[in-house]
A protein has these predicted regions:
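Bacterial Sec-dependent N-terminal signal peptides
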Residues: 1-25
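Metallo-beta-lactamase
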Residues: 25-28, 36-38, 43, 75-76, 83-84, 130-172, 176-245, ...
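Conserved beta-strand hairpin/beta-sheet module of binuclear metal-dependent hydrolase folds
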Residues: 42-92, 179-192
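Divalent metal-coordination and catalytic microenvironments
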Residues: 47, 70, 80, 95, ...
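Structural recognition of the beta-strand scaffold that forms the well-ordered cores
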Residues: 50-52, 69, 77-79, 104-108, ...
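Extracytoplasmic/secreted envelope proteins and their assembly/folding machinery
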Residues: 67, 88-92, 116-119, 213-216, ...
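Active-site metal-binding motif and surrounding structural segment of the metallo-beta-lactamase
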Residues: 74-77, 86-130
Length: 250
């Protein structure tokens, strides 16, 4: 009887381990959770949300611009603002009223409008902003909204009981482009440093094309576990976006 009980317990343990492993490896099905004419929000992982707003340009038309919201507990961190204050207000309201979360920080990943165009809305809600010292300097020169808190190469912030990071790997799309990462979902926010599959080189007015591929190679080496890679514009995917970007600028 004792041996039978031990065998039964062992079988239960094996079933539990298998079930837990299966749940952990089950693919997440993305779902759109908010849409207006100015902002679309899609849940792309358990605690990661893609936000898309729009920027009217002379050369590329009305461009969709990506950003990321990561969550743990009742706190979130936002990578890149929506492009305008009104769409930023929509995002802030959605996080507050639908997710029931506090925005701990917003992190523009470089100094262009598609990263910090809606920054003033966050400041009006007393949400602290963080960016590299280079981004702050370039934003001032370009008369853009200016992030409040600076860092040199690496920023690590708590969100709930987890961490989110922003890190400078080198020049590419701009002198100041940083990459966001949220390890609990293995999600990378590459911003405009990373291109969607089949994208053109895009705007190069502030780029360092000679260094671009080498910078992305460093990103790839730093985050071998990344499962979701989000470019600044267009469709997100996996690490194939890194490989595509590396080849595009070689």
């Amino acid at each position: 009887m004792k041996n039978l009980s031990q065998t039964f317990l062992l079988l239960l343990l094996q079933v539990f381990v298998f079930s837990t492993h299966a749940q952990k490896n089950k693919a997440f099905t993305p779902k759109e959770v908010y849409q207006s004419k100015d902002l679309i929000i899609t849940q792309i992982a358990d605690n990661s949300f893609l936000h898309v707003s729009y920027h009217q340009t002379n050369d590329f038309g009305n461009v969709p611009c990506n950003g990321l919201v990561v969550r743990n507990g009742h706190e979130v961190i936002v990578f890149d603002t929506p492009t305008k204050d009104n769409s930023a207000e929509e995002l802030i309201k959605w996080v507050t009223e639908t997710l029931h979360c506090q925005i701990k920080a917003v992190i523009p990943t470089h100094f262009h409008t598609d990263c910090l165009g809606g920054l003033n809305a966050f400041h009006q809600h007393n949400i602290p902003s963080y960016a590299s010292f280079k981004t702050i300097e370039l934003a001032k020169e370009d008369k853009m909204p200016v992030p409040q808190n600076g860092f040199k190469d690496l920023l690590t912030l708590k969100v709930g009981k987890k961490q989110a990071t922003a890190r400078f790997f080198g020049e590419g799309h701009t002198k100041d482009n940083v990459v966001g990462y949220f390890a609990p979902d293995d999600v990378m926010f590459g911003g405009c440093l990373i291109k969607e599959i089949d994208a053109s080189k895009g705007y190069l007015g502030d780029a360092n094309v000679a260094e671009w591929s080498a910078t992305v190679e460093k990103v790839k080496a730093a985050y071998p576990k990344a499962k979701i890679v989000i470019p600044g514009h267009g469709e997100y995917g996996n690490q194939s976006l890194l490989d595509y970007t590396i080849q595009l600028f070689k």
